[in-house]
Every structure is written in C-alpha cells, then in structure tokens.
Amino acid sequence: MFLDIVSGYERFLIIVLITFLVSCFFVYQCWKIYISPWSHIPGIATSFPIIGNILSLTSRSDSLKNLDGYHKRLGDTFIIWILFKPVVFSCNIDLFDSILKSSDKDFLEKGSGYETFRDWIQDGIVCSTGKKWQKRRKQLTTCFHFNMLKNYLPIIDSHSQAFVDILKKEGGNVIQDIAKLTKLMSLGIICESATGMNLMNKENEAKLHQYLESLEVVSFLTAERRRRPFYYSNIMLKMMHIGSEYQKAVKTVHAFTRELIIEAVNHYNESNPKSNFLDILSSLHHNGEIDTEGLMEETNTLIFAGHDTVSASLAWLLYNLGMNTVAQEKAFHEAEIVSKMEGSMEEKMKQMKFIECTIKESLRLRSTIPFIARCMKKDVSFPNGMTIPRGTELVLNFRAMHKDNDVWQNPEKFIPERFDGNSSSQRPVFSFVPFSAGPRNCIGQRFAMMELKVSLFHILLNFKIEAVDKESDLAEVLDVVMNNSGGIKLKLSERT
C-alpha cells in the first residue's frame, strides 16, 4: 500500500489533500445544482453561509427600506437567498405580463410565505391552490357580483356617516393613529355585509374590540413569522413565549368568526333571497357544496381581507390628501357638487371622477399590499433572455413597479390627474396593480373601491384634513399590510 511507505506526517498531508479535493468536488456539485441556475441574476454582495441574505429582511423597521435600495442598485430584478431558498424580486413589466395574466397552474401557486397565514385564515381562497382554489373562486365570485354589491352600498354609506360622527367627537385634536379608527369602521362594514347584522352597538362593542385586539396580535406575529424563518415551524413557535400568545389570539379570532357562522346557518332560509356573503355560503353548505371547515376558511379570509387592507388604504389616502391640499380641495369641490345631485348613492358614485383618481394615486404611491409571491413550477424567460428557473420563489414587487421612473413621471409625487382617462391608456396594462391582476386578482376589489369612495366622500364633506408628520418622518413598515411604525397622525378640522 502506498500509505504504508510514507511517513506519518506525509500520510496526514495526503489525507488532508484528498479530503480537501473531495470537499471541493462536493461544494462544486452543490453550487452547480443549487446555485449555478440562478448565478446570472444580480444579487446582493453581502451574503453569509447557510443563512444567505436573511439578515437584511428580519428588521421590521428596515426591511422595506432595504428592498427599495436593492431595486435602485441592482435593477428591476434581483435575487436574495433565504437559507437555501432562492427568492427573486422583480418589477419587470414583461415578467408581470407573463405571470399575472397566465392561467397556467405552474404560475398560480402562492409562495411559501403564505404558509404563515394557515393557522389564521387556513386554506381559504387566499392560500389554497389547484382544483380547490378554482372551485372556491367560482363559488365566491357570486358574492361580489354587481347585483350583490348594490346590497352592500347602503351598509357602506351608513357606516361611513357613523364614522364621520366618531371623527367629530375628536374635536379637532390630533388623532394619533387614524388607522385604528378606520379599522373599526371597516370591520363594521364587512361584518354587516357578511351577515346582514349591524354589530356596531353597545351590546357587541366589547366583543369587537377584543376581536380587533386579537387580530392585531395575530397580524403582527404572522408578519414576524414571515420575517424570521425560525418561527416558520409550528413546533419551534410553540416552544417560545410568543407561540402561546399567538395561539390564544387565533382562538379568539376563530371564536368570533364561528359565532357569526352559527348565527347565519341557524337563520338560513332557502326561500329567502341571498342578500349577503354568509347567505350564499350557507346556501352552498345546505346543498353540500362546501363543508363547515370551508365556511370557517372563507369567512376568516373575507373578514381579514375585507377590512385590514381597506382600512389601511383609507388611512394612507387621508394622509396623502392631508399632505396635498390642492388635490384635497379639488376632491372636496367635486364631493360638494355630487352631494347636491339628485339620485341614489350608486348614481352619485359614478360622478366621483376625481375622487376615484385620488384613490388610485394613493394606492399607487403607498401600496398596502406591496408584494405577492408565486412558486415557479417551471422556467420562465424574459424577452431580454434572462431565465428564472423552476423552484424559484418569485416576488412580484408592486411597490417598485408603482414607482418605476420608466413608467411614471415624478413617481414620488402625489398627482391624481395621472389617472384620468387619457393618461391611463398610455401606460402598460400591468403597471398599476394594487389589487393584483389576472386569475388570482383580488376578488373583492370593486367592494374595496366602493368603500374607499363613499367613506372619502363623507369625510371630505365634513373635514379639512391635515397630515401631522412630514413624509421624511414616516417609517413605513410591512406587517401583514403596510403601516407607519409610529401611526398615521392626522388633524381633522370641521368644515363650516
């Protein structure tokens, strides 16, 4: 044997050399299989073994800022590594076009980040995939049909007027976080639209506040789980203090939903017209088309998606108008003219042209859902030749697209006029996607726009809006939706 005729020292060196060469070969094979397919995509220089770039995303206060910086530095598409998972962020318009309009099942599966929602909203329409998602999407579309939306409009109008009364009680003082108040209004709207029952009364006040407090805990800890992968595992989560806090809050949220469902199912009458969300779900349940678990899944999803995103959008809309008095006064004058018109609120809404422009511009400037993620089941190629391999988690960055200099002139400025008919028609189809687009777009987007229009209409008629914080003082953070770390402070002065 060769090793028998060499000294112990030489034998040691040979073993070290062989080990080194085998290790190099192993590392090369790992690189070839796990890294090389993505090596052509620009990436962040600061990366660590095993954990990758995860440290740049774990901070609640800095993660959005970091991602904005990477887009400016690396271009419209770049890769980060979270543990061993490749995550590609993109605001490339051609890629948006390829992915969003596609009905190919290989592009429709949601990214792994949505798994952190499952304890809360379970396998509802937001998280489900495949045939289950297709079936549920078809079933739930009825809930947001044009004729159903007519039923919801008086509810939205009534709660918006009640919201104005709540704001008047503030007496012109600085509201420390308008989002806390808009949440309560939006929750009242979605609950009554879902059940036909107005829960905004003394009898239910404590229950609603408990629900909102628990929902705030669930939302915050869900966002924390997305930022910190070692919280992904339910086993790991249960071993930590926040795990018990999280589970307790989830139980409270589910108990609230369960009570609504029991009430709806007990009062279901097949001969009555279907006038709300739970009427339709109860009908499906009665006919055996959806089980009790499905009722829970979709009701939890509806209440979360129907109030959290809309309330945040309204809060940011009021802030943006508070920062832009010219646009605010123009919107007020339109509201004043519309208020004097004859006809129903439905007819009046059609005349709120500039108000709609301000809403769209606010959704562009501050997207409350700045990203969506898809798991690529096959390769996708850009027209410029770049390929994103299958197995990639692809994050479509709406926030970056909505501020792309190539699409929007002065993208950091609030200019509602860019959404008048002429300007809108000159932009790429998928350059403005606050509700996503294509087969997996937001099923309730028309409901959301109705709520934003009507509530803003009533607020403008009654108040002048003044933003307290300068834009430079904001600290935008991504929880489940985009918020301001210190709250959105406003001063509302009654119009005389």
Predicted regions and their residues:
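Conserved cytochrome P450 catalytic core segment spanning the I/J/K helices
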Residues: 55, 145, 217-225, 245-314, ...
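Cytochrome P450 heme-thiolate "Cys pocket" and heme-binding signature region
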Residues: 142, 305, 422-452, 476-478
